[in-house]
Regions:
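Short phosphate-binding loop-to-helix
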Residues: 17, 23-83
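Conserved core of the sugar-phosphate nucleotidyltransferase
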Residues: 73-167
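N-terminal glycine-rich phosphate-binding loop and ensuing alpha1 helix
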Residues: 1-20
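Short, high-confidence coil segments that cap the C-terminus of an alpha-helix
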Residues: 13, 59-60, 87-91
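Hydrophobic/aromatic residues located in beta-strands of well-ordered beta-sheets
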Residues: 16-18, 63, 93, 121
Length: 167
């Protein structure tokens, strides 16, 4: 958690808070920050926890949810998500990254995302979508992926919301 926190505090003009339902995590995090919010335990998702945290804080108009399993999150990515939320048309943002390895493409732990032409997410899957096979229905190689006309993207577990979206 501290590594994620340390990455997040590098974002200029951003206040960083840890939202948790665990007294144990709260106590542990007091070693490096006082910005800890204790939330209810019964949230069905992290987004619900973020909504409660934003309600507790009261005065922020947008929030970026960086989960604790992202110790190498790029502070520039967080800044870019905040920047995207400045648009009046944008209520919620997330991030994706091009997949360059067949191993990642077929790894069910890597969530894939399909987007429309404006990069709006259409759907997510742990499977390779659309399916990528050669003419004989065999998985392709990294070199073939590199030269494929189809781009594949992995979803990054980071989300940004406007307060009004979470209300």
């Amino acid at each position: 958690i501290q590594r994620v926190y340390d990455q997040c505090i590098q974002v200029k003009d951003a206040d960083v808070f840890i939202a948790t339902d665990s007294e144990e995590i709260k106590t542990s995090c007091t070693n490096f920050t006082e910005n800890i919010l204790l939330t209810r335990k019964n949230h069905p998702s992290a987004t619900d926890r973020i909504a409660e945290a934003l309600e507790q804080l009261g005065h922020y108009e947008s929030v970026i949810n960086v989960q604790a399993d992202e110790p190498f999150v790029d502070p520039k990515l967080i800044s870019n998500l905040f920047k995207a939320l400045e648009s009046k048309e944008v209520q919620m943002v997330s991030a994706m990254k091009k997949i360059h390895s067949v191993k990642d493409l077929h790894n069910p732990n890597v969530v894939k995302v399909v987007t429309d032409m404006q990069n709006n997410a259409l759907y997510f899957s742990r499977a390779c979508i659309p399916a990528l096979l050669d003419e004989e229905n065999k998985k392709i190689t990294n070199e073939e992926l590199k030269h494929s006309s189809q781009s594949y993207f992995k979803h990054l577990g980071i989300y940004g919301f406007k307060r009004t979206f979470l209300a």
